[in-house]
Amino acid sequence: MSDTFKKFSYYHHSPSAVQKPLEIDLFQKLLKARGESFQFGSPVTIGRAVEDVASAVLVNGMDHKEALRHGTSGLDSHEAVPWEQGEMARLDLPRGDTLEAMSGYAIEAISQALSKANQIKGQERLDKKYAGIVLPFLGYSDFYGGNRVVELKVKTTAVSDSKAGRRAGSLPSKPDSNHATQVAFYADVLNCPATLVYVSEKGFKIFDETNCEELSTPGFANNLKELKARAWARENIMRCAPDTRTLMQMLSPNFQDWGWKMNPEHLEEARAIWGLNQS
């Protein structure tokens, strides 16, 4: 691999990260290269807990109740991150009946999507090199079986307030286009159809080639072209700068993007790159 990309701590393209604004992706890679720890908000923690429980049941054959006991360990250790303070100070991570409901819906939906599978496999590393792009793509699928890959997305609102209480995450009427583009890569590597499963504490929705054009073969082809175009463009941009700081200064940041929700010290460091922390 050329030092052109190593100097940015860029070793591969991710089907999800390549859809982020480049300046956010670069800064996160800079922090990771320094060994900085990342803080994740409660939705990420909840999503991981639901996936862990579903995987324990579907992949490892564990009893649901036993899987729930293991799944709550990550929730118990979660601490509210800085952007969940103030109005969001009363963090209410779902446990007990709520986590049981969400994970139960996940298990039901994934089982339905993979009804033809004799065996369900869990997270799998997937990589592929494409012509015209120097760096390979690397991603991790959630569930696979019966020649179909399933990506699980958990929709939840983890914050309670005195008036409304904690609200359930809303299920989408159609898949998020970024999610559809992400699974296009998995479908391409595994040469199989793909399904997107959305779960909340109120139910689930399943999207596949039968009810979503983006998850059809032509839809995957178009989304894969977009992924490769984004990767190709990033590599071209990285060839134009000597270091991460200079490259980031060539880009225009939008600090309203959720990707900038991070440790305040890290955010201040990022803003300084564009001189935005000066009085």
Predicted regions located by residue number:
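Hydrophobic/aromatic-lined pockets within catalytic cores
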Residues: A54-M62, V154-T157, D188-N191
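Flexible, glycine- and charge-enriched loops at secondary-structure boundaries
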Residues: P43, P172-D176, T217-F220
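Metal-dependent nuclease catalytic regions and adjoining charged, substrate-binding loops involved
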Residues: D188-S279
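Short acidic (Asp/Glu) and glycine-rich catalytic loops that position anionic groups and cofactors
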Residues: Q28-R34, V154-T156, K202-D208
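Metal-dependent nuclease catalytic cores that hydrolyze phosphodiester bonds in DNA/RNA
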Residues: M1-Y140, L276
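Short glycine/proline-enriched coil/turn segments at helix->beta-strand junctions
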Residues: D63, N118, G145-R148, V189-P193
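An active-site-proximal "capping" alpha-helix that borders the catalytic cofactor pocket
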Residues: V50, H179-L190, A194
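Non-catalytic protein-protein interaction segments used by genome-maintenance enzymes to assemble
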Residues: D127-Q182
